[in-house]
Every structure is written in C-alpha cells, then in structure tokens.
From Swiss-Prot:
Residues that span the membrane, as ranges: 9-29, 79-99
Name of the molecule in the record: Large-conductance mechanosensitive channel
Gene for this chain: mscL
Localisation: Cell inner membrane
Family: Belongs to the MscL family.
Source species: Pseudomonas syringae pv. syringae (strain B728a)
GO molecular function, one term: mechanosensitive monoatomic ion channel activity
Membrane topology value: Multi-pass membrane protein
Function: Channel that opens in response to stretch forces in the membrane lipid bilayer. May participate in the regulation of osmotic pressure changes within the cell.
Amino acid sequence: MSVLKEFKAFAVKGNVVDMAVGIIIGAAFGKIVSSFVGDVIMPPLGLLIGGVDFSDLAVTLRPAQGTAPAVLLAYGKFIQTVIDFIIVAFAIFMGVKAINRLKREEAKAPTLPPTPSKQEILLGEIRDLLKEQSKPAAPITVDPARTL
C-alpha cells in the first residue's frame, strides 16, 4: 500500500477526525477564555484591589540599559494565565461530569430483549416438534378385567 493510501486511510478514521475537531474547538475556546479573563474578570478584580492592572505587575530583575530592554519577571501575566487555566479546567470538568452522568443514565435504562424474527420462531417450533417426536411412547397397559 502506498504511503498516500495509508495516510488517507489514517486521516479519515473517525478518531482522527474527532480529535482534529476537538483541537480546533479547544483552541477557539482557549481564546474566548483568555479574553474573558483579561477583559472581563481581571479589570474589576484589579479595581477592587486598588486600581491594579495585573498585566503590568512585574519585578524588574535588570533595568533597561541603552538599547537593551529591561529584564522583567512578569508575574501579573502569570496570574492571568493561571486564572485562564482554572477556568478552562473547570469547564472541562463540568463537561466530563455531564457526559459521565449521561452514560450512567444510559446504562441504567433497561434494554428490551430483541424480538425474534419469523425464522427464529419457526426454528423454535421445529425444535419443539423434534423433541416431542424423540420422546419414547408411553407404555401400553392392559387391564385384564376389561379383556373380551
């Protein structure tokens, strides 16, 4: 099999396509969460703390010298990233929890036995007839008082 055919067989498998869709949706979801944290959560939080902009929080390790920029330890951006992660992890947890609940409900649902087909019913009747025919006949008893 050529490499192209093998790749095509691999790429169109359900799991690979599902994974690709999940990665694309996950990347888009990550951007939404980052915007939510940076634009919606952090500004009010910074205002409550005293007008602090978290993205500007940093410790200067070495000040700028000439054309060389300052070396900063930007812990404010790290705090935003941690909050991003917590929100994404919580959203994933809630999604997995919902899926697990649906699986449990699906497992609890009683499944009805399949109805036999006409052929299966006919085969069952033939089996029963063959069993009846293979039984030995009941012995004949003669009552001497009723003899002619």
